[in-house]
């Protein structure tokens, strides 16, 4: 546990996140790099030996198993799957009269647009939710993983469902089903000492969603401050996203209820907050770090105040990389005050540094505290111009 008053998870001085959705087998070099540089890792659930290695050599690292909340995939050989309900099990249940596949109005199963062999499941069906929770909890009970990252906690139709479909007149039905699945899975996982960290899509659009869905371990924002290399959230929405996640990231999670004498109690830990921002392929002239990575990292510090767990930057769906930047080793310490707003620029002072980001579309000249140096150890002027969607 870190010594910061925020009690950050992941270990002191480590702020990187390893978000791995598959790809080539993990190498020993990648594992050793992760031990030195990452506060949190999301691995495929069958990568058990990698999880054991990370927990042995970096016990403070949060290591999560990927599980999709909304789909099953027909291409996975097993015996461990990235879904709560394997394709073969779902087919077997359907043949026995318990069909949990989603269907179009004509009766066809729904394969996700852009993701072949991914099939939408009936998240609104209590039966599907029961099988999902039962399967995942049994798998996690004696697992080296700290818990589960629940992917596709969706807010809108991202995969060509083209509503209405059978049993689903609108996205409200799907959202409500996911609300219930997250609550049920989270409570059951917490009961065995594990956490649930959903990939909470567009929480800024529904007041309180981040708080509710992160209540069982934390949350993951996959589109931090933007969707693509040049596709950013407009300034009001970027600020709303940052403040919404910061507000919802506080508080403790109760794990593994136990008995002490005649009293019932549980251990607690802080929530995990993971961010991922899209790479831009534009490099900082000072350190060579991707400009969007720096923008996201500045937001990580400004909005998180030193309490967020880890951040990553990748290309779209490029989740077999080991992203890193020199700036991820900069520990700014604890927040020395709140967020200071200068137009579309958000700044914050820390006990060992300062961070700022411009969420707007125009350049802004910002005032800088005295006695600061940059990454090259050069004195920082009292003011400078922060470009649109730039962070320092």
Question: What residues fall within each predicted segment?
Answer:
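Glycan-processing catalytic domains of CAZymes
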Residues: 1-392
């Amino acid at each position: 546990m870190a010594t910061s008053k925020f009690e950050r998870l992941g270990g002191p001085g480590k702020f990187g996140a390893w978000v791995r959705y598959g790809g080539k087998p993990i190498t020993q070099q990648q594992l050793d790099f992760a031990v030195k540089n990452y506060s949190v890792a999301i691995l495929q659930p069958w990568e058990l030996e990698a999880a054991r290695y990370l927990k042995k050599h970096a016990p403070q690292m949060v290591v999560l198993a990927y599980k999709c909340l909304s789909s099953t995939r027909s291409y996975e050989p097993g015996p461990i799957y990235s879904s709560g309900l394997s394709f073969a099990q779902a087919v077997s249940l359907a043949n026995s009269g318990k069909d949990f596949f989603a269907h179009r109005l004509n009766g066809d199963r729904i394969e996700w647009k852009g993701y072949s062999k991914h099939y939408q499941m009936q998240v609104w069906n209590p039966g599907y939710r029961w099988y999902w929770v039962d399967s995942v909890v049994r798998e996690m009970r004696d697992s080296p993983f700290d818990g589960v990252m629940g992917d596709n906690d969706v807010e809108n139709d991202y995969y060509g469902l083209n509503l209405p479909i059978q049993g689903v007149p609108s996205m409200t039905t799907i959202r409500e089903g996911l609300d219930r699945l997250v609550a049920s899975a989270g409570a059951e996982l917490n009961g065995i000492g594990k956490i649930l960290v959903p990939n909470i899509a567009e929480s800024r659009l529904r007041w309180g969603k981040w708080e509710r869905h992160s209540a069982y371990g934390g949350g993951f924002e996959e589109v931090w401050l933007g969707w693509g290399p040049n596709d950013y959230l407009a300034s009001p929405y970027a600020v709303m996203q940052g403040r919404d996640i910061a507000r919802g990231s506080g508080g403790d999670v109760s794990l593994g209820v136990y008995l002490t004498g005649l009293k019932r109690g549980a251990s607690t830990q802080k929530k995990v907050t993971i961010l991922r921002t899209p790479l831009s392929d534009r490099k900082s002239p000072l350190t060579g770090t991707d400009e969007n990575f720096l923008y996201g990292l500045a937001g990580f510090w400004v909005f998180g105040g030193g309490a967020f767990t880890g951040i990553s930057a990748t290309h779209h769906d490029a989740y077999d990389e080991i992203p890193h930047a020199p700036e991820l080793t900069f520990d700014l310490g604890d927040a020395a005050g709140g967020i200071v707003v200068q137009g579309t620029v958000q700044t914050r002072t820390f006990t060992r540094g300062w961070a700022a980001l411009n969420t707007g579309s125009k350049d802004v000249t910002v005032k800088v505290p005295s006695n600061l140096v940059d990454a090259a150890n050069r004195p920082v002027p009292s003011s400078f111009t922060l470009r649109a969607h730039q962070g320092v």
